[in-house]
Amino acid sequence: MRAEYKDAEALTELVGIIWHDTPEELTEIIRSYMASDDSAVFAEKANGEFIGVALCGLRRDYVEGCDTSPVGYLEGVSIREAYRHRGIARKLVAECEQWAREKGCTEFASDCELTNTASLDFHLHIGFSEENRIICFRKPL
């Protein structure tokens, strides 16, 4: 289901599993995804509590392996541990993919950390193909 603005605080803990900003920052990030026409938040509930969340958006800059623009992009998916391996993440990603199709996208992409083998396995299992591996650098000026 498409999450609503009023759900942002309740989703903060779930998003905090994958992103390590402060709870206040996470709530604002979630709200910004909900407020934009270029992004969406989908969530799943069980027994009255949120057990899964997926955030997606449109990327108009270069996306590894993609030839079109915009590209639908899975920004993050998080499932409570007790509910993993039940198809919930797959369902949420499918909702993101449908949203991207409705936005005119013909490609859908994502990423994960090089060391996150569980995420890599999940992506491959639901039909993504690995396009590239990179290491990012920075230095102060």
Question: Which ranges hold each PLM region?
Answer:
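Conserved acetyl-CoA-binding loop-helix of GNAT-fold acetyltransferases
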Residues: 79, 85-98, 121-125
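Conserved active-site alpha-helix within GNAT-family acetyltransferase domains
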Residues: 90, 102, 114-133
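Conserved beta-strand in the GNAT
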Residues: 43, 49-58, 73, 78
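Active-site rim helix/loop that mediates acceptor-substrate recognition in acyltransferases
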Residues: 21-45, 55
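Conserved GNAT acetyl-CoA-binding A-motif
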Residues: 93, 100-112
